[in-house]
Amino acid sequence: MPNPNSICAKAGILIGGKSQRFGSPKWNAKIGKTSVLDRLWDVCSDFEKRVVVGKSKPNQIKKPFLSDLTASQAPIFGLYTLLYNSEYKWNLLLSCDLPLLTKNLLKKIWATRDDQADIILPNINGINQVTCALYNKNLIGEVEKAIKNESLSLQDLVNESHVKKIAVESWNQELTNMNTLEDWKRIKCKEENKTSN
């Protein structure tokens, strides 16, 4: 039966980072009994298509997987791989740095899209959330050009694109960033306390 809440877009979850500050693959870190990747996969369940994007597919991952088209490390390569392999106009680029993301926030981002824009971008206190944003498939030429010019910052791509920014200060908790083991321990503790109350 069709999902009435279905989002006509593709979600790409990036697992490709080296996680040097974290010390192990972030996607496999557990919060409660669930890995970060599984949490984000569930959060994206309203999207018509979901895929994991990374350098090479770990044996533990049984989900649909796209291998990056280049071995270089930067989220822009994951974005290029996602757009290149997508049949959808809109594509969510999502990193495993955001384990507390919710369906409601993704619905808000989707509901505020503007078909004249290249990127639909959440913004908290002036900080762009470039790895929790919708990217238009039409942007692929600009992404390719940026890669050729070795301009590998997604923020630089944002600065050169037609962007719709969404103020999401009230969603600060959902966009908590997990970069270090200390971040993970803090998030894990908070979530476990929430479920035990």
Protein language model features and the residues they cover:
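Nucleotide and nucleotide-moiety/phosphate-recognizing core
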Residues: 2-151, 156-175, 181-182, 188-192
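Long, low-complexity, intrinsically disordered segments
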Residues: 194-197
